[in-house]
Every structure is written in structure tokens, then in C-alpha cells.
């Protein structure tokens, strides 16, 4: 399947809807916490066990993005979106089978492993294409697409909760909900497959700079630079801090206010998940667009510095005020989403657009690491605290202190980012081909 090149006159504004159709679908991953309570009840799982499909999905997202990034660059976004469609939908179908048979390992394999591959390939598939279509506004462009990933749970959370209420929270009801998800997302993602196009190579797009303007760094050279690894740490720390809340959002707010006169209902908890998704989505377009104005390093200073302050406020005062808890969580999740949306533009600023998709894919191994660290820290500590007889907000106090420390580490790593040494730059593809041709002729 060759990359579909846009014909003359093709509007670049048709590409973001194609990206959104994929990212809104795979963004369902952020609504996994809605399935945790019924799975724990139906299959007798602990909080740590019920997080496994989500954790494995994030691990596979990073690994498939890292190993598939170069392939996606070569084969193009339509091929990648097709692979994502097949894997993501198949993951739900396998999970439906696992739930109906009450075989939890099959849910972990289907949603986590197979679906996780779809997450990774689907996540990176439109990003480099959008950067090439919008070289003049890379932060806004990637924010539009990645906004969909953050907003997917805004749709999926109440939708999933309604299905579980209608179908029932037992294993058969969960299986039917998984089945409906898989089939519905397959249809929606197909729209993106049919619509996506790539810009003509090395041509300016609507008066902007050339698609390959400026210094370029290959993916192989990029991972040898300190800038890549500083950004890896920045992304890992920011994601760990956000994903720790997001993965356990519904039970967390219920636990936090369980001992108050106005406990949080299941419906309200699902609404909280939807609010977090809205903040996640808004942060992806809002903060990433802001980065086009104030710069990538400055916006990450906000994400990491203010994020640490928000965690401190929750740890100190969160259980005394629902509005404060919700507000701080929303700010943290907006920074979490903004961090994802801004990092492709940060990579473009440092390494150019030549292989930015492949570089982005390799950087997403930081997400894989964070996908294990965040839920593990929050769930494991909460389980141990519960075993010790503690309850309510005390289940999460130590976790939040750890998150503050991780954000400080990320802040320091961001301060260490500097422009890439010119020795890592490579010739643009045309120039490189000309040099190789001269060398072969002289030989």
C-alpha cells in the first residue's frame, strides 16, 4: 500500500479529521477505569490485577510505536491506520471472548497486547503527516490530532458506563460491551483510512516553509544525542504523573470522599472520568498551540513545575474539598495531554521533519515505561495501604508525594535540553542522493 499523495488543490484541513477519527477511537484506552470495578466484581480481581490490560496496552503502544515508526514513515499513514484498525478492533473482540468465557488472561492478551499494537501504530500514524502538512504551526497541528486521543474517553466513558448499566456488570454484559466497542470503532477508524493524504515531497504547503526545510537528523542519529534522552525523561515523568490519576480515576475519587457526608456515586465517578478526558483533550490543543507562541521548553516548565504544585495541593488539602480535588486533577490532566501534544513539535524543533515520525515512535517508549510506573505506583501502594487497614484519601498520600518527586526530575531534564550539535545533522534526501550518485560515479 503506497502512501496516498494529495493531488493539486487538496486542502490540508481535510487531514486533521482523518487523524481525529483514529485518535478519538484509540483514545478509549483512557476510559479503562470504567471497566475496572465490574471486572473486579465479576472475576474476583484486585485493583492491581484489573489494571493489567491497560498497563500492557500502554507498554505495547510504546514498543509498537518504537519498532514500527520507521515502517510507518516508509509505508505511509494509510497503511498504518489500516493496521491500527485491525489490531485495535480485534483486541476488543478477543476481550469479548475472554469475558464471556471468564478467562481474564484472554482480556489481558486481547486488549493489552493486540489492542496495544493498534494503539501504538494508530497513535503515530497521522502525527508526522500533520507536521509535514503544517510546518508553519506544528504545535497546533499535532495538538489537533492528539486532542482526539485525549478526548476519546470523553465519549467512551459515559458510553461504556451506559452499556454496562444496560447490559449488566456481569461477565456476559462486559463481553457484550467489548463487542459493541470493537465493531463501532472499526467503522469509525475506516473513515480516517479513506480520507488521509500525504503532501507532495519537498514542497511548501500553503505559503509555509518547505516540508524538509532546516537541519535534519535521522532517527538513528537522534537516539545518540543527549537531547533525545532528556526529552525521554521529560515525557516519562510527565506521563507517569498524569497516568497515575487517569488509570484509577473512578475508584480514586470514590475512595477520597468515601468517609464524607456526601460520598461520590458511581455515576458521578464516571462523570469525573469524562471531565478528566475533557481537560486532557483541551490541554492537547490549548497548551500545544500556546507552545507555538512561547516555545516548547517554556511550556514544559509550566507542565512540570505547576503540575508538582497541583499534586502538593491534592496531597495536603484534596480530601477536604471536592472542588479543589477536581480542579487540581483537571489541571494535571491538561498538562498531561499538553505534554503529549507538544512533544512532536519539540522533536521537530530539535531534529527536523525528515524522520520525525520514527523519532517520535522511539520516544514513546517513555510512555511504555510510564504506563507501567504510574498505575503500579498508585495501585500497589493503595492495595498495601488497604491491607494495613487504611482507607479514604490515606490510600494515595504516598503516591502523590512520589509523583511530585518525579515531576521535579522531569523539570531538571527539560532544563538540560540544548540545540542539537551540527555533527548529528544529515543532508536532506535530495542532497544525500546527489552525493551518493557522485560517489558511485567517481568509483
Enumerate the predicted regions with their spans.
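Intracellular juxtamembrane helix-capping segments at the cytosolic ends
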Residues: 39, 120-134, 141-142, 338-351
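C-terminal membrane-cytosol helix-exit motif in multi-pass small-molecule transporters
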Residues: 182-209, 410-418
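Glycine-rich segments within core transmembrane alpha-helices of 12-TM secondary carriers
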Residues: 137-158, 361-375
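Extracytoplasmic gate region of multi-pass secondary transporters
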Residues: 32-37, 157, 220-288, 371-378
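Helix-loop-helix hairpin linking two adjacent transmembrane segments in secondary transporters
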Residues: 149-198
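C-terminal transmembrane helical hairpin of 12-TM major facilitator-type secondary transporters
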Residues: 235-244, 267-343
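Helix-to-loop junctions at the C-terminal end of transmembrane segments
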Residues: 64-77, 283-296, 382
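C-terminal ends and interior cores of transmembrane alpha-helices
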Residues: 86-100, 306-319
Amino acid at each position: 500500500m503506497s502512501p496516498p499523495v494529495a493531488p493539486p488543490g487538496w486542502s490540508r484541513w481535510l487531514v486533521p479529521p482523518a487523524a481525529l477519527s483514529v485518535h478519538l477511537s484509540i483514545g478509549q484506552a483512557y476510559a479503562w477505569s470504567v471497566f475496572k470495578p465490574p471486572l473486579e466484581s465479576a472475576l474476583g480481581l484486585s485493583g492491581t490485577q484489573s489494571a493489567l490490560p491497560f498497563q500492557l496496552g500502554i507498554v505495547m503502544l510504546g514498543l509498537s510505536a518504537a519498532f514500527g515508526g520507521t515502517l510507518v514513515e516508509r509505508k505511509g499513514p494509510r497503511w498504518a491506520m489500516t493496521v491500527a484498525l485491525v489490531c485495535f478492533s480485534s483486541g476488543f473482540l478477543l476481550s469479548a471472548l475472554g469475558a464471556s468465557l471468564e478467562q481474564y488472561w484472554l482480556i489481558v492478551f486481547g486488549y493489552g497486547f493486540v489492542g496495544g499494537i493498534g494503539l501504538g501504530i494508530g497513535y503515530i500514524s497521522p502525527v508526522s503527516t500533520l507536521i509535514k502538512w503544517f510546518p508553519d504551526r506544528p504545535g497546533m497541528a499535532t495538538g489537533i490530532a492528539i486532542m482526539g486521543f485525549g478526548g476519546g474517553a470523553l465519549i467512551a466513558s459515559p458510553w461504556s458506563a451506559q452499556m454496562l448499566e444496560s447490559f449488566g456488570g456481569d461477565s456476559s454484559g462486559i463481553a457484550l460491551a467489548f463487542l459493541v466497542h470493537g465493531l463501532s470503532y472499526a467503522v469509525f477508524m475506516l473513515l480516517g483510512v479513506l480520507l488521509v493524504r500525504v503532501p507532495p515531497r519537498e514542497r511548501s504547503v500553503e505559503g509555509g516553509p518547505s516540508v524538509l526545510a532546516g537541519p535534519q537528523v535521522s532517527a538513528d542519529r537522534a537516539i545518540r544525542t543527549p537531547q533525545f534522552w532528556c526529552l525521554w525523561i521529560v515525557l516519562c515523568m510527565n506521563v507517569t504523573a498524569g497516568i497515575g490519576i487517569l488509570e484509577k480515576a473512578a475508584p480514586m475519587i470514590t475512595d477520597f470522599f468515601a468517609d464524607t457526608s456526601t460520598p461520590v456515586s458511581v455515576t458521578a465517578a464516571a462523570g469525573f472520568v469524562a471531565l478528566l478526558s475533557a481537560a486532557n483533550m483541551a490541554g492537547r490543543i490549548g497548551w500545544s498551540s500556546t507552545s507555538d507562541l512561547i516555545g516548547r521548553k517554556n511550556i514544559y516548565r509550566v507542565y512540570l513545575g505547576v503540575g508538582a504544585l497541583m499534586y502538593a495541593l491534592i496531597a495536603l488539602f484534596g480530601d477536604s474539598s471536592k472542588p479543589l480535588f477536581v480542579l487540581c486533577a483537571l489541571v494535571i490532566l491538561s498538562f498531561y495531554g499538553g505534554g503529549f501534544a507538544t512533544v512532536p513539535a519539540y522533536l521537530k524543533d530539535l531534529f527536523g521533519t525528515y524522520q520525525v515520525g520514527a523519532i517520535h515512535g522511539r520516544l514513546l517508549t517513555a510512555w511504555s515505561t510510564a504506563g507501567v510506573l504510574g498505575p503500579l505506583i498508585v495501585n500497589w501502594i493503595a492495595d498495601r495501604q488497604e491491607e494495613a487497614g487504611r482507607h479514604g484519601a490515606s490510600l494515595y498520600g504516598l503516591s502523590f508525594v512520589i509523583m511530585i518527586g518525579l515531576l521535579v526530575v522531569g523539570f531538571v531534564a527539560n532544563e538540560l535540553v540544548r540545540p542539537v550539535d551540527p555533527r548529528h545533522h544529515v543532508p536532506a534526501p535530495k542532497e544525500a542522493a546527489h552525493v551518493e550518485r557522485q560517489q558511485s560515479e567517481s568509483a
